[in-house]
């Protein structure tokens, strides 16, 4: 009986550990919780305040599809999406709007 309880506890702790690691890996990849089909509406809002809508949408959609995340608002807040924030051009400038 005691072995059964230990085995179940070990199984539960292992499962909990694997779920935690999975969440950390996802956060390291960008914290993306969006589905690719949600990118269009998120980027439409993100680019709604710019006068350069076409390039903004192009790069926002590219970034969203890679990172599965778009920062909230029309400007800034990139710290909420590390992948989106850290993707740079060859010149070192931000790739994502």
Curated annotation (Swiss-Prot):
One of its GO terms (cellular component) is plasmodesma. Six disulfide bonds may be present. Residues 1-27 form the signal peptide. Induction: Down-regulated by gibberellin. It is found in: Secreted; Secreted, Cell wall; Secreted, Extracellular space, Extracellular matrix. InterPro entries: GASA. Keywords: Cell wall, Disulfide bond, Extracellular matrix, Gibberellin signaling pathway, Secreted, Signal. The keyword DNA-binding does not apply. One of its GO terms (biological process) is gibberellic acid mediated signaling pathway. It holds the Pfam family GASA. Gibberellin-regulated protein that acts as a negative regulator of gibberellin-induced flowering and stem growth. May inhibit flowering and inflorescence growth via a pathway involving GAI and by enhancing FLC expression and repressing FT and LFY. Acts as a negative regulator in thermotolerance by resogulating both salicylic acid (SA) signaling and heat shock-protein accumulation. Belongs to the GASA family. This is Gibberellin-regulated protein 5. It comes from Arabidopsis thaliana.
